[in-house]
Amino acid sequence: MTEEFDIRQERYRGNDGEREVENKLRPLTFDSFSGQDKVVENLSIFVAAARLRGEALDHTLLHGPPGLGKTTLSNIIANELGVGLKITSGPVLDKPGDLAGLLSSLESNDVLFIDEIHRLSPVVEEYLYSAMEDYRIDIMLDKGPSARSIQINLSPFTLVGATTRSGLLTAPLRARFGINLHLEYYDVHTITGIVERSARILEVSCSHDAAVEIAGRSRGTPRIANALLRRVRDFAQVKGSGAIDKPIACYALEALNIDRYGLDNVDHKLLATIIDKFAGGPVGLSTIATALGEDPGTIEEVYEPFLIKEGFLKRTPRGREVTELAYTHLGRNPRPHRPSLFD
């Protein structure tokens, strides 16, 4: 499963050149950010108010599926505040010393962005509490009878935490965020505009019909839309004239096994596994993960949300179950109705 082409993981597999292109496509201001209208409206007000008062913005939690703009919004927050930004992630902060070094390097009102904040180790999270509330941390030196604590005072700062699994955050950590915002999947119209903007930045000709086609297969996710645009551009340059029109876009997307719903080989394999091996479900997440050779957290965090949103998969108290739409989409005969105790 991990060897299949998976456009959702392109951000992590890309080389330095690809990451440079991705950064080039990021909006730098609230005005240039498309979609998430209510989130952007509220954030822009909070940021403007903090700037007027000369204070650090309240700690902010951004949560929602991957690729919707959490990292981009953290960059915009720092840009709009006119302060510095430091970026890290939960798994990287192994020890309290890692956190202390990062926090002590922040200047007044700077922004610290922690991606995957739900993956912070408990001991690091404990140290973060006093930093968020009182702008100080207490570090223990030595062990045993000679152990002593030193207090490090910090400059006021804003912590922007991002997570795809807000339910895994502990209650004490969640309570320390003054701003809590959820990002939703984008509609096709908004994604089309993002594709057209990215095409202009990349200096590639892209027709409106082609942009609509790419947007329709992007799973409502800007990161995927931009990744698909770059791959379609490759096909246009090698197999076409260099310009992206609807025929070359369709050709490229079919070659990448991205269907009209935006499902790829990984999605098809997941749904087919539940149908073929488990009679359509219900089946437990860990059982599915074992059958696919994949991590349960990856399935739950990366693959499932869109399949559930689009009606291909549902969660029940007894496990995951595919829907009639999944049978139809895969060209399978829907299973017979199973009578319940109340039929």
From Swiss-Prot:
Q: Which GO terms describe its cellular component?
A: cytoplasm; Holliday junction resolvase complex
Q: Name one Pfam family in it.
A: RuvB_N
Catalytic function, reaction form: ATP + H2O = ADP + phosphate + H(+)
Which residues does the annotated region (Small ATPAse domain (RuvB-S)) include?
187-257
State the UniProt keywords alphabetically: ATP-binding, Cytoplasm, DNA damage, DNA recombination, DNA repair, DNA-binding, Hydrolase, Nucleotide-binding
PANTHER family to which the protein is assigned, alphabetical: HOLLIDAY JUNCTION BRANCH MIGRATION COMPLEX SUBUNIT RUVB (PTHR42848:SF1), PTHR42848
Q: Per its record, how is this protein called by name?
A: Holliday junction branch migration complex subunit RuvB
